[in-house]
């Protein structure tokens, strides 16, 4: 097992870094080049430690800068050179193995058995350097690598000479040691992270240094690391020792002019127990390239790849401290106890009430909450779900600044300097905290809003709550987007226009606040853009703009009253035919939701309808239609970059569409706030053609009669209209009906009063005196509202014929019923107020002749219904009996066991005649008339000419009729009372009653249950039965004709 540990001692603040992992005394070279670092060879007399590396932090040198002062790592208890007490020692200890003498000898002479340590700095920026710009870039050189074998017995002077002569690779200083001996003030460098990568190299033993440099080397993979932290002071160039170094450095690109801190955070990656073996394929950046293609020199780390990886990382103090450090894996050999960590005093972080903070919970995540209460050592946090929790300050983190979390583990700890919170509250809408702006604080949640960023704030309203807290569980009320013209001249917008978040083309902002009114809108629909402030304004809110524009018609030069000293500047630009077609296709696409439009069916009618409103010259408006059509066709062909012909997409060539679905391009006219607008400026500077101003008389006549725009209707993108399609016609119909009713009332007053119909009942039967009911003329496509209105109109007209005046005894005067208030009851029920009045059309001759001797009043009406027809010689009509219900007798089973219905033939000539009380027959005009009834009756059979009587075949009778004939007797042809006038026989009476009420045998055939309760015989021999029909207590006496 491998054990990696390090020691950190605090007797003296370390100032320098070196890598002497091989002990070899050397003499300093007085005339050494500028300060560098290098490897020191191991003495030949000592037994080398197998795979052991020591990393030291050296103090500043004492004496001249040219004198090299070195410290050596201890590999045994006896050493001749002192070891500085302030060291960080990283030891890679593998299990000691007993090797044979031959292997031991080979190990001692192998130059690459010892580990090479490379320091790779991933810090993307250096915060401050007290160096001029020309020296700053030369101080930190690109990443370089240099590997030096342990064998060969080279001295320090030889190594320095080797590095200076360029035999090996030119070495660069480590990131902590700048290459200079300048006596300028010490430079300050802040490094976020340093990865120490341990590479093990295994090659055969070369005999000389030159041969070892040309041998291909195979680096081992980087050992998985556990991060530990240590605070190291920065190193000044004036205290650097002179030696050779094989470390790497990263040049920094960010500089600032002030010094911030004197400590750097160094993160040492320590391997864990899952260490890979040397035989594992290499995963280091230098192993990406193939060993066979590598140069004889040792593999290098590319500067570009490393810098790219450095820039892709986001080293920050918060990210490092957010994750707790993982403790190191317990080693197999017990490591020495680590020294107590050095912790800088963390600055005090204060939190205020109603401040939003992050709280770190047990799951490792941060949750947003608001401080609502505090004690001496705890804070009460309320979360968004209304839950509350007491937290200590070390678990809190400021929303916009640093953190007070102190993390420690593995013998190291870090603290981060926090930024102080802003002095005043911040608006949650615009995320700004300006001193001159007033931020209103919600009383419940503590969130702040500028008065211009929300519409709920009312000045002087006292306690205020935001919309989120005022109605947390209710749906938002629909905001009224009705555009109303503001009163007076607007000199100041009710919102902060500079805080709006606009898109790239400055057409739409995220807040949806526009115009003088601060309400939303659509830039391509009745809105114009100011040429100075570039804000968009509704045409309805402008002072003298009365027109409605087409979608995408923004060819105006407009300046608002805020930018133009209270006067609006509006000028219309003249457009070309290509813009006319673009506007036409853009509107058709918005309204019809189609991409392609036919030239003759869609585009041509639209331009003919709208060409008097489009900004084209008067000559083009008066073009003949043939010339206009030719101009449109030629324009569509010439501008193929804006219009698409249907031929390109396998459509008819008469179809066209926009290549890009946006509105037409408008000339950009933007001016500075101090520039003065004029027509000359627009024509000379921007080369615009302006339309002449329209006279005011046309604007005054416009509201009188505005032609209906057939293309002006709502689309899915437009706001919904509150009025439905049926309400407008209903209102028009109601107004028209009121006018007609008033006219009829005036005519009715001019006509002479008619006598009361109740006093003259002789005229009741006259059809000329009765108003015939007028059927309503209902259209199939009319709505229910129209039907209801017409029916109510009929009711109002018919109610005028009745006497609706109420007396003192009526229910409406007592107020006992609301229905009586709506429909007042009449005074009497005579004449037309009779509820049983039936307006029947009758012939005048019959009415005059029969009405003599009839009673007056209700009796006369009943007699008029059931009176005899003296001259009637008609034959009785054949009426089919009513449909009967299906009974069990009608169901049969076929030969194949299928269920069938029994078919019974019903003869239309089978008429049931029963004897009952003598009443007048019902008039024939109340009975249904069929086509077969209109046929003339068959002529009576006369005597044949051949003198022989033909034998008449008996007619087939129905089962019900045969059953009736077998149980009953036949009736006489005339009544017993002697009233046998022609046409008034009992047969006609019984036939009419049977046709109207239905016969007993029909009811029996229909399956209606019945029971015979009694039987009697009359004096004339007629037998009558008392029949009780199923379920009814009432009985009916039915006379059956017997023999």
Curated annotation (Swiss-Prot):
Signal peptide: none annotated. The modification Phosphoserine is found at residues 805-806. Pfam families: Mtf2_C. Residues 737-757, 793-804 have a biased composition (Basic and acidic residues). It comes from the Eukaryota. Its main location: nucleus. GO terms for cellular component: cytoplasm; nucleus; polytene chromosome; Set1C/COMPASS complex. GO terms for biological process: actin cytoskeleton organization; anterior/posterior axis specification; chromatin organization; negative regulation of DNA-templated transcription; regulation of gene expression; regulation of transcription by RNA polymerase II; ventral cord development. Residues 399-412 have a biased composition (Gly residues). Residues 349-404 form the Tudor domain. Residues 1-34, 271-302, 317-346, 395-422, 737-819, 931-985 are annotated as: Disordered. It is found in: Nucleus; Chromosome. Residues 783-792, 945-954 have a biased composition (Basic residues). Polycomb group (PcG) protein. While PcG proteins are generally required to maintain the transcriptionally repressive state of homeotic genes throughout development, this protein is specifically required during the first 6 hours of embryogenesis to establish the repressed state. Component of the Esc/E(z) complex, which methylates 'Lys-9' and 'Lys-27' residues of histone H3, leading to transcriptional repression of the affected target gene. Component of a form of the Esc/E(z) complex present specifically during early embryogenesis which is composed of Caf1-55, esc, E(z), Su(z)12, Pcl and HDAC1/Rpd3. This complex is distinct from the PRC1 complex, which contains many other PcG proteins like Pc, Ph, Psc, Su(z)2. The two complexes however cooperate and interact together during the first 3 hours of development to establish PcG silencing. Interacts with corto in vitro. The PHD-type zinc fingers mediate the interaction with E(z). Belongs to the Polycomblike family. This is Polycomb protein Pcl. The gene is Pcl.
């Amino acid at each position: 097992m491998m054990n990696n540990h390090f020691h950190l001692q605090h007797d003296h603040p370390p100032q320098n870094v070196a890598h002497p992992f091989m002990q070899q005394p050397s003499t300093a070279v007085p005339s050494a080049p500028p300060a560098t670092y290098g490897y020191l060879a191991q003495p030949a007399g000592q037994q080398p430690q197998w795979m052991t590396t020591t990393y030291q932090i050296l103090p500043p040198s004492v004496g001249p800068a040219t004198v090299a002062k070195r410290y050596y790592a201890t590999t045994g208890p006896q050493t001749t050179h002192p070891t500085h007490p302030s060291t960080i020692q990283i030891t890679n200890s593998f299990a000691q193995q007993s090797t044979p003498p031959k292997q031991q000898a080979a190990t001692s002479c192998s130059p690459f058995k010892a580990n090479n340590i490379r320091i790779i700095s991933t810090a993307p920026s250096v915060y401050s350097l007290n160096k001029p710009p020309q020296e700053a870039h030369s101080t930190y050189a690109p990443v370089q690598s240099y590997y030096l074998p342990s064998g060969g017995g080279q001295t320090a002077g030889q190594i320095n000479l080797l590095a200076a002569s360029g035999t090996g690779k030119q070495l660069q200083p480590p990131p902590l040691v700048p290459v200079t001996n300048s006596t300028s003030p010490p430079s300050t460098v802040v490094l976020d992270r340093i990865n120490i990568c341990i590479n093990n190299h295994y090659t055969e033993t070369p005999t000389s240094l030159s041969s070892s440099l040309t041998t291909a080397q195979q680096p081992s993979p980087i050992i998985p690391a556990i991060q530990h932290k240590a605070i190291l002071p920065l190193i000044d160039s004036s205290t650097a020792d002179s030696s050779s170094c094989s470390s790497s450095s990263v040049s920094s690109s960010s500089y600032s002019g002030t010094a911030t801190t004197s400590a750097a955070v160094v993160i040492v990656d320590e391997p864990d127990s899952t260490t890979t073996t040397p035989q594992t394929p290499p995963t280091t950046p230098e192993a990406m390239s193939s060993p066979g293609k590598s140069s004889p020199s040792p593999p290098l780390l590319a500067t570009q790849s490393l810098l790219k990886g450095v820039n892709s990382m986001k080293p920050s103090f918060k990210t490092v401290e957010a994750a707790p450090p993982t403790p190191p894996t317990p080693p197999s050999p017990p490591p020495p106890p680590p020294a107590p960590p050095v912790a800088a005093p963390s600055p005090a972080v204060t939190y205020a009430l109603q401040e939003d903070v992050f709280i770190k919970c047990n799951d490792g995540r941060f949750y947003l909450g608001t401080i609502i209460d505090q004690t001496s050592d705890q804070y009460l946090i309320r979360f968004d779900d209304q839950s509350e929790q007491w937290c200590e300050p070390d678990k809190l983190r400021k929303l916009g600044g640093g953190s007070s979390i102190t993390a420690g583990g593995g013998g190291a700890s870090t603290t981060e300097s926090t930024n102080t919170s802003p002095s005043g509250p911040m608006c949650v809408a615009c995320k700004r905290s300006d001193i001159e702006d007033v931020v209103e604080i919600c009383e419940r949640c503590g969130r702040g809003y500028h008065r211009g960023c929300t519409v709920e704030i009312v000045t002087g309203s006292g306690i205020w709550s935001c919309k989120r807290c005022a109605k947390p569980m209710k749906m938002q009320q629909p905001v009224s987007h009705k555009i109303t013209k503001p009163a007076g001249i607007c000199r100041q917008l009710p919102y902060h226009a500079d805080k709006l978040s606009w898109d790239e083309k400055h057409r739409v902002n995220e807040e949806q606040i526009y115009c003088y009114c601060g309400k939303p809108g659509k830039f391509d629909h009745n809105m114009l853009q100011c040429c100075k402030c570039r804000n968009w304004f509704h045409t309805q809110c402008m002072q003298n703009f009365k027109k409605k524009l087409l979608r995408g018609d923004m060819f105006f030069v407009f300046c608002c009253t805020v930018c133009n000293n209270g006067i609006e500047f509006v000028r219309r630009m003249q457009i070309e035919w290509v813009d006319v077609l673009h506007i036409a296709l853009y509107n058709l696409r918005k309204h019809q939701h189609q991409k392609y439009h036919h030239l003759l069916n869609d585009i041509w009618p639209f331009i003919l309808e709208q060409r008097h409103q489009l900004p084209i010259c008067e000559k083009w408006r008066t073009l003949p239609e043939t010339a206009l059509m030719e101009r449109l066709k030629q324009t569509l062909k010439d501008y193929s970059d804006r219009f698409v012909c249907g031929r390109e997409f396998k459509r008819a060539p008469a179809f066209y569409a926009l290549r890009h679905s946006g509105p037409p391009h408008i000339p950009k006219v933007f001016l500075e706030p101090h520039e003065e607008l004029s027509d000359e400026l627009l024509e000379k500077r921007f080369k615009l053609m302006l339309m002449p101003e329209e006279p005011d008389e046309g604007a005054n006549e416009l509201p009188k009669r505005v032609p209906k725009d057939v293309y002006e209707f709502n689309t899915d993108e437009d706001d919904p209209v509150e009025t439905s399609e049926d309400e407008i016609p209903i209102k028009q119909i109601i107004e028209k009906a009121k006018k007609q009713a008033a006219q009829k009332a005036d005519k009715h007053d001019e006509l002479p009063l008619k006598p009361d119909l109740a006093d003259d009942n002789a005229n009741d039967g006259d059809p000329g005196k009765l108003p015939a009911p007028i059927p309503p003329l209902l259209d199939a496509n009319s709505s229910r509202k129209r039907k209801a209105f017409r029916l109510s109109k009929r009711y109002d007209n018919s109610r005028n014929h009745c006497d609706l005046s109420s007396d003192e005894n009526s229910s409406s005067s007592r107020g006992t019923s609301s229905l009586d208030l709506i429909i007042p009851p009449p005074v009497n029920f005579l004449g037309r107020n009779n509820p049983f009045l039936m307006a029947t059309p009758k012939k005048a001759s019959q009415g005059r002749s029969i009405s003599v001797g009839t009673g007056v009043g209700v009796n006369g009406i009943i007699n008029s219904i059931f009176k005899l027809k003296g001259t009637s010689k008609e034959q009785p009509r054949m009426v089919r009996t009513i449909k009967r219900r299906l009974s069990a007798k009608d169901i049969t089973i076929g030969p194949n066991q299928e269920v069938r219905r029994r078919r019974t033939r019903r003869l239309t000539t089978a008429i049931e005649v029963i004897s009952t009380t003598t009443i007048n027959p019902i008039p024939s005009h109340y009975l249904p008339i069929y086509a077969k009834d209109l046929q003339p009756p068959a002529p009576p059979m006369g005597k044949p000419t051949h003198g022989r009587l033909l034998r008449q075949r008996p007619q087939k009778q129905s089962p019900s009729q045969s059953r009736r004939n077998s149980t009953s007797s036949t009736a006489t042809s005339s009544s017993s009372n002697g009233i046998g006038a022609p046409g008034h026989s009992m047969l006609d009476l019984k036939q009419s009653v049977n046709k109207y009420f239905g016969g007993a045998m029909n009811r029996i055939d229909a399956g209606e249950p019945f029971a015979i309760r009694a039987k009697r015989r009359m004096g004339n021999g007629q037998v009558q039965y008392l029949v009780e029909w199923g379920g009814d207590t009432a009985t009916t006496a039915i006379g059956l004709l017997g023999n």
